Amino acid sequence: MATKVLDSWALIAFFEDEPAAGEVEKILQRAADDKHKLLLSVVNWGEIYYNTMREVSPEAAEQKARDLAALPIDIVGVGDDLALARQAAIFKATHKMSYADCFAAALAKLKNAELLTGDPEFKALEKAIKIAWLK
């Protein structure tokens, strides 16, 4: 079973019914049908939470957390071995990207997985990781 990593961009597009929402919905359905495994870094989970809290309300952020928990996505923590944090730090030191995006990219690299995003910030990493561009 192939493993894919979601960036917060993909999930925000899904929740906000942006143009890529249908594509993300199909990806989520394939994961629910055990066609592939979906991963999300806990840092990107936090990015979705704080953006919702900041832009809408604390209650909306809690609802979004419940909505995320209901999706067929495994949340990956940073853990004690520091490999994920180290790779994210390397990406941050060598590319002009947000630190949260560096965690999504690092997770994709460490899991040899495809990153699903539409965020142009990841163009700098096209040679370092596999990226599926959502539109």
Each language-model region and where it sits:
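Short, well-structured N-terminal submotif of metal-dependent ribonuclease cores
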Residues: 1-40, 53-66, 134
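Acidic, PIN/NYN-like endoribonuclease modules and their adjacent C-terminal/linker elements
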Residues: 1-3, 74-75, 105-135
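Acidic active-site catalytic centers that drive phospho-/nucleotidyl reactions
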Residues: 7, 47, 101, 119
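A generic structural signal for short hydrophobic patches within well-formed alpha-helices
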Residues: 11-12, 45, 122-123
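Anion (oxyanion) recognition and catalysis
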Residues: 32, 69, 109
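Short glycine/serine- and small hydrophobic-enriched flexible loop segments
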Residues: 50-53, 109-110
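Active-site neighborhoods of divalent-metal-dependent phosphate/nucleic-acid chemistry enzymes
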Residues: 74-116
